[in-house]
Amino acid sequence: MNFPSKLLEDAVLEISKLPGIGKKTALRLVLHLLKKESKESESLANALLNARENIRYCKKCHTISDHELCAICTSNKRDKRVVCIVEDIRDVLAIENTNQYFGVYHVIGGVISPMERIGPDQLNINSLIERVITDTEIKEIILGLSPTMEGDTTAFFITKKLKSYPIKISTIARGIPFGGELEYMDEVTLGRSIATRTLFETKED
């Protein structure tokens, strides 16, 4: 793609680095921004910079937050006895949109993947174990991981680590097809899968 302006080319190049955005889409976005009032472009830039500099991760559940503890962890309306384990913030948002879950979360930050050299130590699994040990209020862990090979491996690993503790370990029902990801499931299917969750069983059980 040949550009009549180096400035335009640089802007398109930077935006095309974002996931799922090719150069044609990036060009369309840049041209759209150029047509807007400068204040609107400045507002976008400031919002991104502000988010980058000030957003933090919840000290307890590791989801994105404006404060040390997120709004979900500090809410008196949430059932602190139930903790849903998810991969990242997108899964939290997907589950919240179902309006079917009222517990809290623990974001582990991915799944175990030997191919990508991601092991348990690279994830927020140790903090999950520590949370279960220290928080006697927790009665149930829901494995809200995507039904992929890596997701199942991670679920199995977590289950083995928590097996000796007096808590119920369940998994969202398999209304979600194998290989699918939670964030792409429709709200009705995902909500039903959470409501009809079942006990997680390993092959050794």
Swiss-Prot record:
One of the GO BP terms on file: DNA repair
The keyword Membrane belongs to this UniProt entry's keyword annotation: no
PROSITE patterns in alphabetical order: RECR, TOPRIM
UniProt zinc finger (C4-type) residues: 58-73
Family: Belongs to the RecR family.
PANTHER family per record: RECOMBINATION PROTEIN RECR
NCBIfam families the UniProt entry points to: recR
Function summary: May play a role in DNA repair. It seems to be involved in an RecBC-independent recombinational process of DNA repair. It may act with RecF and RecO.
Protein name: Recombination protein RecR
Species, as recorded: Cytophaga hutchinsonii (strain ATCC 33406 / DSM 1761 / CIP 103989 / NBRC 15051 / NCIMB 9469 / D465)
Organism placement in taxonomy: Bacteria, Pseudomonadati, Bacteroidota, Cytophagia, Cytophagales
